[in-house]
Regions:
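Membrane-embedded alpha-helical bundles of multi-pass transporters/translocases
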Residues: 1-199
Length: 199
């Protein structure tokens, strides 16, 4: 149950962030070339995190990795919220690296936790249920994405977003709150739930 709750919260935060990202770079940063670079750096960082996960786990322990990863995403969200108005692409990318490093480690840790749940289920019940468990994970991801899509539509309406027009300062600020601050709060909750209840 803890894994399911953690995955739902994590996916919701990611969907809010990624759903607004292109709007943010189009109207907030006003640089789609930087958007492509930012996404590419993020992808490379997440792959690097997956590769480094086993080594980091050996040093700090798997449970601590997840908590540290949540902290990295929160720092990344906070950093992007602060520096996005400074016009400094390097600082923005550095904050993005912190965020994506956390995301990569969380993805790796979640896969390990699910595998452990399968093994534990086999130990306790005498049967492996990986197909059910991994299907449930896929369903959760799709459900979270769909639900966040509704929230994004509502959020755009709430901040008075006007397509293909210059956005007001309040609209840009609202966009940053939805894609950075709300996901940061969700990741704090995710870290607390995991740290307190995952054994």
């Amino acid at each position: 149950i803890v894994i399911i709750v953690s995955v739902i919260i994590f996916q919701a935060s990611q969907a809010l962030y990624s759903g607004f990202l292109v709007y943010f770079f189009t109207y907030g940063i006003k640089d789609l070339n930087l958007y492509a670079t930012f996404v590419a750096i993020g992808t490379v960082t997440q792959v690097a995190a997956l590769i480094l996960f086993p080594r980091i786990s050996k040093v700090v322990g798997r449970k601590n990795v997840y908590t540290i990863a949540c902290i990295l995403t929160v720092l990344g969200f906070g950093g992007m919220f602060i520096v996005s108005g400074m016009g400094n692409s390097i600082l923005l990318c550095l904050a993005g690296i912190a965020y994506n490093l956390g995301v990569g480690l969380i993805n790796a840790a979640t896969t390990v936790m699910i595998s452990n749940a399968v093994d534990y289920g086999e130990y306790k019940l005498g049967k492996r249920s990986e197909s059910i468990i991994f299907s449930a994970q896929t369903f959760i991801v799709k459900f979270s994405t769909a639900f966040s899509g509704l929230i994004i539509g509502f959020g755009l309406s709430l901040i008075k977003y006007v397509p293909n027009a210059t956005q007001t300062a309040s609209t840009i600020f609202g966009m940053k709150v939805i894609m950075f601050l709300i996901p940061a709060v969700l990741m704090v909750i995710c870290a607390v739930v995991y740290s307190k209840y995952y054994k």
